C-alpha cells in the first residue's frame, strides 16, 4: 500500500485499540494478588475445539494424555472458567481482570480441529500441532502463534489481531482484514490462497501455486518461488515478492 494509506489506516486502528485498552484499564475489574498457584482441572468431556477470550493466555501441547491446568493469581483462580460444551473448550473469565501476575491456561490435547481467540487473548503452541485439518480465527487484538503440520489450514484474522505460523502445510487459505496480520513466512505451503483488505498484511511461503488478492490498502508478500501465480491488487492493495 502507499505510505500515506498505511499511515492513515495504522493511525485509525491504533486509536481504536488504544481507546479500547484504555477503557478496559479504567473500568471495574479485579487485580491479582501476586500469589500464583496451580489448579489441575478434570476433563469431563471430549473436545477438539478451543475458544479463548478476555485477555487470557493459553498454551497448547499436543499430547496423548489430555490435561487442563490453570496457573493464576490465587484470588483470580475462581474467575477463570474452563467449560466444555458441544466439543468446544471455552476459556474465559467471569469478571474483568485488570492486572495479573499470571492468567495462564495449559491445555494438553490429543487432536485439535479449531482454535478461536478473541478480545486480546493469546494462544501459542508448545510443540508442533500435527493434524489433517485446522481452522484458526482471531479478532479484537488477539494473537495466535503456532507451529503446525497439516494438510489443510484455514486462517482468518480481523480487527487488529495477529496469526503467526511456522511448520508446513499442503494448502493454506488465509484472510486478513481491518489492520490484522497473518505472518506465515516460516510456514512452508504447497498451495496458498490469500486475501488481504482494509490495511491488513499477509506474508506466505509457497512452492507450487499462489492465488492472492489485495484490496483497500491490504498488503501481501510472498516467497518460495511458486510455479503458478494468480494475483490481483486494487484500491491501493499490493501483492509483491519478497
Question: Where would I find each of the regions flagged by the language model?
Answer:
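Intrinsically disordered, low-complexity terminal regions
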Residues: 1-158, 162-177, 181-242
Amino acid at each position: 500500500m502507499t505510505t500515506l494509506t498505511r499511515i492513515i489506516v495504522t493511525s485509525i486502528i491504533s486509536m481504536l485499540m488504544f481507546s479500547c485498552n484504555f477503557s478496559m484499564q479504567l473500568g471495574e475489574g479485579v487485580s491479582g494478588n501476586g500469589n500464583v498457584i496451580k489448579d489441575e482441572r478434570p476433563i469431563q468431556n471430549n473436545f477438539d475445539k478451543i475458544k479463548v477470550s478476555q485477555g487470557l493466555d493459553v498454551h497448547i501441547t499436543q499430547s496423548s494424555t489430555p490435561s487442563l491446568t490453570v496457573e493464576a493469581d490465587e484470588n483470580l483462580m475462581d474467575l477463570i472458567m474452563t467449560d466444555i460444551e458441544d466439543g468446544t473448550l471455552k476459556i474465559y473469565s467471569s469478571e474483568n481482570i485488570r492486572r495479573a501476575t499470571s492468567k495462564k491456561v495449559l491445555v494438553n490435547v490429543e487432536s485439535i480441529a479449531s482454535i478461536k481467540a478473541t478480545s486480546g487473548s493469546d494462544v501459542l503452541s508448545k510443540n508442533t500441532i500435527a493434524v489433517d485439518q485446522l481452522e484458526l480465527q482471531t479478532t479484537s487484538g488477539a494473537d495466535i502463534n503456532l507451529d503446525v503440520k497439516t494438510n489443510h489450514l484455514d486462517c482468518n484474522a480481523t480487527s487488529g489481531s495477529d496469526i503467526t505460523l511456522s511448520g508446513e502445510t499442503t494448502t493454506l487459505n488465509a484472510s486478513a482484514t481491518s489492520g490484522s496480520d497473518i505472518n506465515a513466512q516460516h510456514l512452508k505451503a504447497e498451495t496458498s490462497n490469500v486475501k488481504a483488505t482494509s490495511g491488513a498484511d499477509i506474508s506466505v511461503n509457497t512452492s507450487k501455486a499462489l492465488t492472492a488478492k489485495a484490496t483497500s490498502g491490504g498488503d501481501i508478500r510472498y516467497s518460495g518461488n511458486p510455479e503458478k501465480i494468480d494475483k490481483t491488487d486494487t484500491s491501493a492493495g499490493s501483492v509483491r515478492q519478497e
